[in-house]
């Protein structure tokens, strides 16, 4: 099953404009820098790739945190870009990283509490925002975007590191079944949070201070990033590209096993596809990923990595990949693997500098703990 991509928008560590971000990808830029969100000197990972521009002022800031505000912004922009309006046949499919009780909210509220709960309100609970529970509803951004845009059709909210792929796959199925005529898909996530950095360090997933690219001989972990992206899918009409997507899970506590990637890649990838890799920068995983993908695409398929430029962006990954790969294929250019110095041996051909391409299709892969994976395939009309 595939659907026509007709509108798109994003907020990324490389910028907010489509052309701006694609130009920076082709220039081989990396957004990684010392954490600009908060003082991270006491964390194992001090680097981050963050969105520079703040969300626009919004009355919804009472109910939405920063990333949720970006999500509502890009949803509206993608609808305008596609030239479509809300209605009963417009569905909304949201993917986000999952519920997180943020430490900056909870620590002031609980650091002076007693074991018996005596005086809990005076000891800190009064410091919680009165809308704290409402701010942590899983479908907050979905509900507000649906109200703002008049999207009254079928839809769903998905959670987890591969929620963007889940949302894309769900939207494409809804279009194929005739449940909606237009599907707005939004993915948003930030790995640049104190609680997330602690978890990534415990898993050994995030880089410390020595920055090396994925698929590099010196790779030793990824840079945490963040993004919000939205695209509009339709069953017919003038398409920028056609999109397919799948998600999967294998129950692993850490990164998914190669067998899961084999199933996903075997289901929708084709010989001759260009490849945008997961970019986890974990040598054993990177090597296994390349072998599994090359079995389908061929050993000489070009390998780029948008996440090397932007950092790992969790639930937003597949949506960002779909937008970026569509733009790159239309330009007939593929970006270099940002930051790559010495490519590790293996199948697939890491792209060292921006190059012209005649490829008309590409796949984008994503993976994260616990055992979650996604794939998106983009094909020009």
Set out the residue ranges of the language-model regions:
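Active-site pocket-shaping loop/turn-to-helix segments
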Residues: 10, 57-76, 98, 133-134, ...
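Structural signature of cysteine-dependent C-C bond-forming condensing enzymes
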Residues: 81-95, 108-130, 147-154, 177-184, ...
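Residues that line or immediately flank small-molecule/substrate-binding pockets and catalytic motifs
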Residues: 187, 279, 366
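Condensing-enzyme catalytic core mediating Claisen C-C bond formation in acyl metabolism
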Residues: 2-11, 18-35, 40, 206-277, ...
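Conserved beta-ketoacyl condensing-enzyme motif
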Residues: 4-5, 26-149, 154, 191, ...
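Short, mixed-charge aromatic SLiMs
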Residues: 99, 190-196, 248-256, 340-358
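Short, glycine/charged-enriched secondary-structure capping and boundary segments
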Residues: 18-21, 106-109, 197-201, 288-292, ...
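Internal metal/ion-chelating core segments
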Residues: 151-152, 157-226, 231-233
């Amino acid at each position: 099953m595939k659907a026509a991509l007709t509108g798109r928008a994003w907020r990324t560590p490389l910028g907010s404009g489509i052309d701006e971000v694609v130009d920076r990808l082709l220039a081989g830029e990396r957004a990684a820098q010392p954490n600009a969100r908060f003082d991270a000197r006491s964390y194992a990972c001090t680097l981050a790739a963050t969105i520079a521009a703040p969300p626009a002022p919004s009355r919804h800031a009472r109910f939405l945190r920063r990333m949720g505000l970006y999500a509502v912004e890009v949803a509206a922009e993608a609808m305008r870009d596609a030239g479509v309006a809300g209605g009963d046949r417009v569905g909304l499919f949201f993917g986000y990283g999952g519920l997180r009780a943020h430490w900056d909210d909870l620590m002031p509220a609980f650091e002076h509490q007693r074991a018996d709960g005596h005086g809990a309100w005076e000891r800190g609970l009064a410091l919680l925002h009165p809308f704290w529970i409402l701010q942590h509803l899983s479908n907050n951004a979905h509900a507000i975007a649906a109200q703002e845009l008049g999207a009254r059709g079928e839809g769903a909210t998905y959670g987890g590191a591969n929620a963007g792929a889940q949302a894309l796959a769900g939207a494409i199925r809804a279009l194929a079944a005739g449940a909606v005529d237009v599907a707005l898909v939004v993915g948003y996530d930030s790995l640049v949070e104190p609680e997330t950095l602690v978890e990534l360090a415990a898993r050994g997933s995030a880089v410390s201070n020595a920055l090396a690219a994925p698929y590099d001989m010196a790779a030793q972990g990824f840079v945490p990033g963040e993004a919000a992206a939205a695209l509009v899918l339709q069953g017919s009409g003038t398409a920028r590209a056609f999109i397919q997507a799948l998600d999967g899970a294998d129950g692993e506590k850490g990164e998914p096993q190669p067998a899961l990637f084999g199933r996903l890649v075997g289901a929708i990838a084709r010989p001759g596809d260009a490849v945008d890799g997961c970019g986890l920068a974990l040598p054993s995983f990177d090597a296994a990923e390349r072998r599994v993908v090359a079995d389908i695409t061929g050993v000489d398929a070009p390998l780029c990595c948008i996440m090397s430029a932007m950092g790992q962006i969790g639930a937003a990954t597949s949506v960002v990949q779909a937008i970026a790969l569509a733009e790159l294929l239309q330009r007939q250019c593929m970006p270099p693997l940002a930051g790559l110095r010495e490519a590790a041996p293996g199948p697939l051909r890491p792209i060292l500098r921006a190059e012209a391409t005649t490829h008309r299709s590409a796949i984008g892969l994503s993976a994260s703990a616990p055992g979650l994976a996604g794939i998106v395939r983009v094909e020009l009309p």
